[in-house]
Amino acid sequence: MAGEGDPEDAAHNMGNHLPLLPAEEEEEDEIEMEVEDQDNKEPKKPNIINFDTSLPTSHTYLGSDMEEFHGRTLHDDDSCPVIPVLPQVVMTLIPGQTLPLQLFSPQEVSMVRNLIQKDRTFAVLAYSNVQEREAQFGTTAEIYAYREEQDFGIEVVKVKAIGRQRFKVLEIRTQSDGIQQAKVQILPECVLPSTMSAVQLESLNKCRIFPSKPVSWEDQCSYKWWQKYQKRKFHCANLTSWPRWLYSLYDAETLMDRIKKQLREWDENLKEDSLPSNPIDFSYRVAACLPIDDVLRIQLLKIGSAIQRLRCELDIMNKCTSLCCKQCQETEITTKNEIFSLSLCGPMAAYVNPHGYVHETLTVYKASNLNLIGRPSTDHSWFPGYAWTIAQCRICASHIGWKFTATKKDMSPQKFWGLTRSALLPTIPDTEDDISPDKVILCL
């Protein structure tokens, strides 16, 4: 077991430390480092989930007495503001995604205090090369909850922020106090017209009906009427040389429905009213919960159209069905079929441990090729009521995530896995058509 002062151990632990074992229990600890293959004997998914899915999104481990702010700060499209950069944040933030932080350095604490007095906005850079700190794109983040406290005489700032707008990096300068200032260009969202707008007479627009999708299908009349509307939606395609299915490939409503079918496989109790109805917000919501690496995520962040972003996300969800260890690249950890949602924001969200490391954690029912390190601990658990145990790759021993086990017998699920996105590599399984996964091109 790594020492408490080991920075690598600090990144993987959720609590301040793992319980130290007496000398006579060292053999027992060795027994706990077993491959978790016994999960295959259990059913894939429990029938009932009685865990309060609002708890992970509230980030109660940061404290319940945080000062909350209201209002939003939005910059004009194509404007070029200068925004301070938080150097500790190393993740590709998606607009609408929540970012929890714990900051300890005096430089960062002072910076956040100044932000609170101004517009509460800072820049999160999407590093294409983390080692060389290279970034061409990023996202603005706005602080909406804030708390200061002292831990053993050290000032600590706890923050909850949310991603707002995409930007392109124009220039980065470092001030005399060490704070980086980024001059950025706010990227606009390109809103495309309806696929049928080119062949429809504008003079008849006042006669057309633009209905909203029924929330419930219990009413048979609403269901039948909606089916008729869907059939007639692309009726004008008969006036063109292209079939109607081609137009549906670029229709926002159709793309959103196809993605929702995929999301229901992750969450059988998914309520459509909990998802954004706007295609732009919906596309960002999906991007934030996709277990993809930074390369693919930056590609999604660069896309300026919700239609194109939705098409790419649907392509990724259909093709990248296997998740492997990023270090080994061939050791399969889990598959898309094992993903499920234990949070209101979806199957994946960002969490921060007491040492300030941010982990985007994906919840899955089953995982393979993993060893457990240490014993379960409830310290600083991101899922209240569950104890966590560090999980490493069986082949290369790199950190993959944690196994969560319920502390009470009446909780469901009794156990699940939380896998950190940075340790996963989405892959395309081999097909019978002898097409190499390397040759399969995603819709990017």
UniProtKB/Swiss-Prot annotation:
Pathway: Protein modification; protein ubiquitination. It is a peripheral membrane protein. Pfam families: LON_substr_bdg, Yippee-Mis18. CDD domains: CRBN_C_like. Residues 1-52 are annotated as: Disordered. Residues 320-428 form the CULT domain. Residues 23-37 have a biased composition (Acidic residues). It is found in: Cytoplasm; Nucleus; Membrane. (S)-thalidomide binds at residues 380, 382, 388. GO terms for molecular function: metal ion binding. Ubiquitinated, ubiquitination is mediated by its own DCX protein ligase complex. Gene3D superfamilies: 1.20.58.1480, LON domain-like, Peptide methionine sulfoxide reductase. Signal peptide: none annotated. PROSITE patterns: CULT (PS51788), LON_N (PS51787). One of its GO terms (cellular component) is nucleus. Zn(2+) binds at residues 325, 328, 393, 396. GO terms for biological process: locomotory exploration behavior; positive regulation of Wnt signaling pathway; proteasome-mediated ubiquitin-dependent protein catabolic process; protein ubiquitination. Residues 80-321 form the Lon N-terminal domain. InterPro entries: CULT (IPR034750), Lon_prtase_N (IPR003111), Lon_prtase_N_sf (IPR046336), PUA-like_sf (IPR015947), Yippee/Mis18/Cereblon (IPR004910). Belongs to the CRBN family. Substrate recognition component of a DCX (DDB1-CUL4-X-box) E3 protein ligase complex that mediates the ubiquitination and subsequent proteasomal degradation of target proteins, such as MEIS2, ILF2 or GLUL. Normal degradation of key regulatory proteins is required for normal limb outgrowth and expression of the fibroblast growth factor FGF8. Maintains presynaptic glutamate release and consequently cognitive functions, such as memory and learning, by negatively regulating large-conductance calcium-activated potassium (BK) channels in excitatory neurons. Component of a DCX (DDB1-CUL4-X-box) protein ligase complex, at least composed of CRBN, CUL4A, DDB1 and RBX1. Interacts directly with DDB1. Interacts with KCNT1. Interacts with ILF2. Interacts with TRAF6 and ECSIT. This is Protein cereblon. It comes from Bos taurus (Bovine).
